[in-house]
Protein backbone atom coordinates (compact mmCIF):
# COMPACT_ATOMS: atom_id res chain seq x y z
CA UNK A 1 0.00 0.00 0.00
CA UNK A 2 2.81 2.35 0.83
CA UNK A 3 4.49 1.63 -2.54
CA UNK A 4 1.33 2.49 -4.47
CA UNK A 5 1.07 5.74 -2.59
CA UNK A 6 4.65 6.70 -3.42
CA UNK A 7 4.12 5.95 -7.11
CA UNK A 8 0.97 8.07 -7.17
CA UNK A 9 2.87 11.00 -5.67
CA UNK A 10 5.86 10.66 -8.03
CA UNK A 11 3.82 10.51 -11.22
CA UNK A 12 2.77 14.22 -11.25
CA UNK A 13 6.33 15.26 -10.54
CA UNK A 14 7.55 13.33 -13.60
CA UNK A 15 4.83 14.65 -15.90
CA UNK A 16 5.24 18.31 -14.89
CA UNK A 17 8.56 18.98 -16.83
CA UNK A 18 7.16 17.33 -19.93
CA UNK A 19 4.12 19.58 -19.82
CA UNK A 20 6.28 22.69 -19.56
CA UNK A 21 8.55 21.58 -22.39
CA UNK A 22 5.67 20.93 -24.80
CA UNK A 23 4.90 23.83 -27.21
CA UNK A 24 1.81 25.81 -26.34
CA UNK A 25 -0.51 27.91 -28.43
CA UNK A 26 0.33 31.59 -28.53
CA UNK A 27 4.09 31.08 -28.28
CA UNK A 28 5.95 32.83 -31.11
CA UNK A 29 7.47 30.39 -33.56
CA UNK A 30 9.81 31.12 -36.41
CA UNK A 31 8.27 30.64 -39.83
CA UNK A 32 9.76 27.61 -41.65
CA UNK A 33 10.21 29.74 -44.77
CA UNK A 34 12.26 32.21 -42.76
CA UNK A 35 14.38 29.36 -41.41
CA UNK A 36 15.11 28.26 -44.97
CA UNK A 37 16.11 31.82 -45.89
CA UNK A 38 18.60 31.94 -43.02
CA UNK A 39 20.72 29.09 -44.31
CA UNK A 40 22.70 30.92 -47.08
CA UNK A 41 25.39 33.47 -46.34
CA UNK A 42 23.95 36.92 -47.12
CA UNK A 43 27.44 38.27 -47.86
CA UNK A 44 28.02 35.76 -50.63
CA UNK A 45 28.20 37.41 -54.09
CA UNK A 46 24.93 37.03 -55.93
CA UNK A 47 21.97 39.08 -57.16
CA UNK A 48 19.53 37.66 -54.59
CA UNK A 49 21.81 38.36 -51.62
CA UNK A 50 22.53 41.88 -52.87
CA UNK A 51 18.84 42.62 -53.40
CA UNK A 52 18.02 41.42 -49.89
CA UNK A 53 20.65 43.69 -48.32
CA UNK A 54 19.55 46.63 -50.49
CA UNK A 55 15.97 46.20 -49.30
CA UNK A 56 17.17 46.17 -45.70
CA UNK A 57 19.11 49.44 -46.15
CA UNK A 58 16.19 50.98 -47.99
CA UNK A 59 13.89 50.19 -45.05
CA UNK A 60 16.19 52.01 -42.61
CA UNK A 61 15.62 55.36 -44.36
CA UNK A 62 19.01 56.57 -43.16
CA UNK A 63 20.86 56.42 -46.44
CA UNK A 64 21.55 59.56 -48.44
CA UNK A 65 21.95 57.51 -51.64
CA UNK A 66 19.35 55.11 -52.93
CA UNK A 67 20.56 51.58 -52.03
CA UNK A 68 19.20 50.24 -55.30
CA UNK A 69 21.87 52.19 -57.17
CA UNK A 70 24.67 50.90 -54.94
CA UNK A 71 26.87 47.98 -55.84
CA UNK A 72 27.76 45.10 -53.52
CA UNK A 73 30.88 46.76 -52.09
CA UNK A 74 29.03 49.99 -51.23
CA UNK A 75 26.18 48.06 -49.61
CA UNK A 76 28.53 46.00 -47.42
CA UNK A 77 30.55 49.04 -46.37
CA UNK A 78 27.34 50.87 -45.42
CA UNK A 79 26.21 47.90 -43.32
CA UNK A 80 29.63 47.75 -41.69
CA UNK A 81 29.55 51.45 -40.77
CA UNK A 82 26.02 51.23 -39.35
CA UNK A 83 26.75 48.26 -37.06
CA UNK A 84 30.31 49.07 -35.95
CA UNK A 85 29.05 50.45 -32.65
CA UNK A 86 32.41 50.85 -30.94
CA UNK A 87 34.00 52.35 -34.08
CA UNK A 88 37.08 50.14 -33.92
CA UNK A 89 37.00 49.14 -37.58
CA UNK A 90 36.00 45.54 -36.77
CA UNK A 91 32.77 43.65 -36.23
CA UNK A 92 32.64 41.18 -33.37
CA UNK A 93 30.17 38.34 -32.99
CA UNK A 94 27.50 40.43 -31.24
CA UNK A 95 27.66 43.18 -33.86
CA UNK A 96 27.41 40.60 -36.64
CA UNK A 97 24.46 38.98 -34.87
CA UNK A 98 22.72 42.35 -34.57
CA UNK A 99 23.33 43.12 -38.26
CA UNK A 100 22.20 39.76 -39.59
CA UNK A 101 19.19 39.55 -37.29
CA UNK A 102 17.97 42.95 -38.42
CA UNK A 103 18.64 42.14 -42.07
CA UNK A 104 17.42 38.54 -42.25
CA UNK A 105 14.89 37.92 -39.48
CA UNK A 106 13.94 40.97 -37.40
CA UNK A 107 11.43 38.96 -35.34
CA UNK A 108 14.03 36.35 -34.37
CA UNK A 109 15.55 38.66 -31.75
CA UNK A 110 12.69 37.82 -29.34
CA UNK A 111 13.31 34.08 -29.46
CA UNK A 112 15.15 32.36 -26.61
CA UNK A 113 17.49 30.79 -29.15
CA UNK A 114 18.22 33.07 -32.06
CA UNK A 115 18.48 30.99 -35.27
CA UNK A 116 20.68 33.68 -36.83
CA UNK A 117 23.50 32.47 -34.59
CA UNK A 118 24.07 29.62 -37.04
CA UNK A 119 24.43 32.14 -39.86
CA UNK A 120 26.95 34.15 -37.82
CA UNK A 121 28.97 31.01 -37.18
CA UNK A 122 28.91 30.19 -40.90
CA UNK A 123 30.05 33.72 -41.81
CA UNK A 124 32.95 33.63 -39.34
CA UNK A 125 33.97 30.16 -40.45
CA UNK A 126 33.96 31.15 -44.12
CA UNK A 127 35.25 34.73 -44.13
CA UNK A 128 37.24 35.16 -40.91
CA UNK A 129 40.54 34.22 -42.53
CA UNK A 130 42.80 34.98 -39.55
CA UNK A 131 40.47 33.23 -37.10
CA UNK A 132 40.39 36.04 -34.52
CA UNK A 133 36.57 36.13 -34.33
CA UNK A 134 36.45 39.65 -35.79
CA UNK A 135 35.42 40.77 -39.27
CA UNK A 136 37.30 43.54 -41.05
CA UNK A 137 35.89 45.39 -44.07
CA UNK A 138 38.28 43.51 -46.35
CA UNK A 139 37.16 40.13 -44.99
CA UNK A 140 33.53 41.15 -45.34
CA UNK A 141 33.89 42.22 -48.98
CA UNK A 142 36.37 39.64 -50.28
CA UNK A 143 34.35 36.46 -50.19
CA UNK A 144 36.63 33.42 -50.64
CA UNK A 145 35.96 31.57 -53.86
CA UNK A 146 35.09 27.88 -53.84
CA UNK A 147 37.81 25.79 -55.59
CA UNK A 148 36.62 24.93 -59.09
CA UNK A 149 39.20 22.36 -60.12
CA UNK A 150 37.85 19.40 -58.16
CA UNK A 151 39.64 16.95 -60.43
CA UNK A 152 43.04 18.20 -59.25
CA UNK A 153 42.15 17.40 -55.62
CA UNK A 154 42.92 13.99 -54.10
CA UNK A 155 40.05 11.46 -54.30
CA UNK A 156 39.59 11.64 -50.52
CA UNK A 157 38.92 15.42 -50.69
CA UNK A 158 36.53 15.32 -53.64
CA UNK A 159 32.86 15.57 -52.80
CA UNK A 160 30.89 12.44 -53.76
CA UNK A 161 28.42 12.99 -56.57
CA UNK A 162 25.11 11.15 -56.89
CA UNK A 163 24.83 8.39 -59.44
CA UNK A 164 23.84 9.54 -62.91
CA UNK A 165 24.91 13.14 -62.32
CA UNK A 166 27.50 14.71 -64.58
CA UNK A 167 30.41 16.79 -63.25
CA UNK A 168 29.79 20.52 -63.30
CA UNK A 169 33.04 21.26 -65.13
CA UNK A 170 32.78 18.49 -67.70
CA UNK A 171 32.21 20.86 -70.60
CA UNK A 172 33.69 24.07 -69.20
CA UNK A 173 36.06 25.99 -71.52
CA UNK A 174 38.51 26.47 -68.66
CA UNK A 175 38.88 22.73 -68.21
CA UNK A 176 39.33 22.17 -71.97
CA UNK A 177 42.03 24.85 -72.10
CA UNK A 178 43.75 23.27 -69.10
CA UNK A 179 43.68 19.84 -70.74
CA UNK A 180 45.06 21.29 -73.99
CA UNK A 181 47.89 23.03 -72.16
CA UNK A 182 48.70 19.83 -70.28
CA UNK A 183 48.70 17.86 -73.56
CA UNK A 184 51.02 20.40 -75.16
CA UNK A 185 53.40 20.19 -72.20
CA UNK A 186 53.41 16.38 -72.43
CA UNK A 187 54.18 16.52 -76.18
CA UNK A 188 57.05 18.96 -75.62
CA UNK A 189 58.41 16.78 -72.83
CA UNK A 190 58.23 13.71 -75.11
CA UNK A 191 60.11 15.53 -77.88
CA UNK A 192 62.81 16.65 -75.44
CA UNK A 193 63.23 13.10 -74.11
CA UNK A 194 63.42 11.67 -77.66
CA UNK A 195 66.03 14.24 -78.64
CA UNK A 196 68.00 13.50 -75.50
CA UNK A 197 67.85 9.76 -76.23
CA UNK A 198 69.08 10.34 -79.80
CA UNK A 199 72.01 12.40 -78.53
CA UNK A 200 73.13 9.84 -75.95
CA UNK A 201 74.72 7.36 -78.48
CA UNK A 202 76.67 10.19 -80.12
CA UNK A 203 77.92 11.38 -76.75
CA UNK A 204 78.94 7.83 -75.80
CA UNK A 205 80.80 7.40 -79.11
CA UNK A 206 82.56 10.70 -78.54
CA UNK A 207 83.54 9.64 -75.04
CA UNK A 208 84.87 6.30 -76.35
CA UNK A 209 86.92 8.05 -79.05
CA UNK A 210 88.36 10.42 -76.51
CA UNK A 211 89.20 7.45 -74.29
CA UNK A 212 90.98 5.70 -77.13
CA UNK A 213 92.94 8.80 -77.95
CA UNK A 214 93.88 9.21 -74.32
CA UNK A 215 94.97 5.54 -73.98
CA UNK A 216 97.63 5.41 -76.75
CA UNK A 217 100.51 3.02 -76.17
CA UNK A 218 104.00 4.43 -75.42
CA UNK A 219 105.31 3.10 -78.77
CA UNK A 220 102.62 4.96 -80.70
CA UNK A 221 103.36 8.10 -78.72
CA UNK A 222 107.10 7.74 -79.41
CA UNK A 223 106.43 7.10 -83.09
CA UNK A 224 104.18 10.12 -83.25
CA UNK A 225 106.83 12.28 -81.63
CA UNK A 226 109.52 10.92 -83.98
CA UNK A 227 107.32 11.49 -87.02
CA UNK A 228 106.70 15.03 -85.87
CA UNK A 229 110.48 15.56 -85.45
CA UNK A 230 111.37 13.81 -88.75
CA UNK A 231 113.61 11.08 -87.16
CA UNK A 232 111.41 8.07 -87.86
CA UNK A 233 109.93 7.63 -91.36
CA UNK A 234 106.28 7.57 -91.77
CA UNK A 235 104.27 4.54 -92.84
CA UNK A 236 104.70 5.26 -96.59
CA UNK A 237 108.45 5.83 -96.33
CA UNK A 238 108.87 2.64 -94.30
CA UNK A 239 107.07 0.62 -96.97
CA UNK A 240 109.34 1.99 -99.73
CA UNK A 241 112.45 1.16 -97.69
CA UNK A 242 111.20 -2.39 -97.12
CA UNK A 243 110.75 -2.84 -100.90
CA UNK A 244 114.30 -1.58 -101.52
CA UNK A 245 115.68 -3.95 -98.88
CA UNK A 246 113.91 -6.87 -100.53
CA UNK A 247 115.34 -5.90 -103.93
CA UNK A 248 118.85 -5.69 -102.47
CA UNK A 249 118.45 -9.10 -100.86
CA UNK A 250 117.42 -10.58 -104.24
CA UNK A 251 120.41 -9.09 -105.98
CA UNK A 252 122.73 -10.42 -103.26
CA UNK A 253 121.32 -13.89 -103.68
CA UNK A 254 121.88 -13.78 -107.45
CA UNK A 255 125.51 -12.68 -106.94
CA UNK A 256 126.07 -15.49 -104.49
CA UNK A 257 124.77 -18.07 -106.95
CA UNK A 258 126.96 -16.71 -109.74
CA UNK A 259 129.99 -16.80 -107.45
CA UNK A 260 129.34 -20.38 -106.48
CA UNK A 261 128.98 -21.34 -110.12
CA UNK A 262 132.24 -19.64 -110.94
CA UNK A 263 133.93 -21.51 -108.13
CA UNK A 264 132.55 -24.86 -109.20
CA UNK A 265 133.72 -24.49 -112.84
CA UNK A 266 137.59 -24.90 -112.17
CA UNK A 267 136.97 -27.90 -109.98
CA UNK A 268 135.08 -29.63 -112.76
CA UNK A 269 137.95 -28.89 -115.22
CA UNK A 270 140.55 -30.36 -112.85
CA UNK A 271 138.47 -33.45 -112.28
CA UNK A 272 138.15 -33.96 -116.04
CA UNK A 273 141.91 -33.62 -116.60
CA UNK A 274 142.65 -36.11 -113.81
CA UNK A 275 140.29 -38.61 -115.32
CA UNK A 276 141.99 -38.27 -118.73
CA UNK A 277 145.37 -38.93 -117.17
CA UNK A 278 144.04 -42.02 -115.48
CA UNK A 279 142.68 -43.29 -118.76
CA UNK A 280 146.02 -42.85 -120.48
CA UNK A 281 147.80 -44.75 -117.77
UniProtKB/Swiss-Prot annotation:
It comes from the Eukaryota. Residues 168-183 have a biased composition (Polar residues). Residues 1-21 form the signal peptide. It comes from Mus musculus (Mouse). One of its GO terms (biological process) is cell adhesion. Ca(2+) 2 binds at residues 128, 130, 132, 139. Ca(2+) 1 binds at residues 84, 86, 88, 90, 95. GO terms for molecular function: calcium ion binding. This is Cell growth regulator with EF hand domain protein 1. The modification Phosphoserine is found at residues 217, 228. Both EF-hands are required for function. Its main location: secreted. One of its GO terms (cellular component) is extracellular region. Mediates cell-cell adhesion in a calcium-dependent manner. Able to inhibit growth in several cell lines. Residues 184-213, 237-256 have a biased composition (Basic and acidic residues). Disulfide bonds: none annotated. Keywords: Calcium, Cell adhesion, Cell cycle, Growth arrest, Metal-binding, Phosphoprotein, Repeat, Secreted, Signal. Residues 71-106, 115-150 form the EF-hand domain. Probably digested extracellularly by an unknown serine protease generating extremely hydrophobic bioactive peptides. Residues 148-281 are annotated as: Disordered. The gene is Cgref1. It is found in: Secreted.
Amino acid sequence: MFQWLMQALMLPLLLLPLGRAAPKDGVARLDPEVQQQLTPNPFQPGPEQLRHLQNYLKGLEKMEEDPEHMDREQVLLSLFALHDYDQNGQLDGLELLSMLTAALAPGAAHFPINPVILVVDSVLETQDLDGDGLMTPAELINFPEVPKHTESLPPALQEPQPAGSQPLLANSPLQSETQQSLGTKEEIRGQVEAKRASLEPEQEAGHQTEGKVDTLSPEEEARGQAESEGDVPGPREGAEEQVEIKDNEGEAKELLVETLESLNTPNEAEAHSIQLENDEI
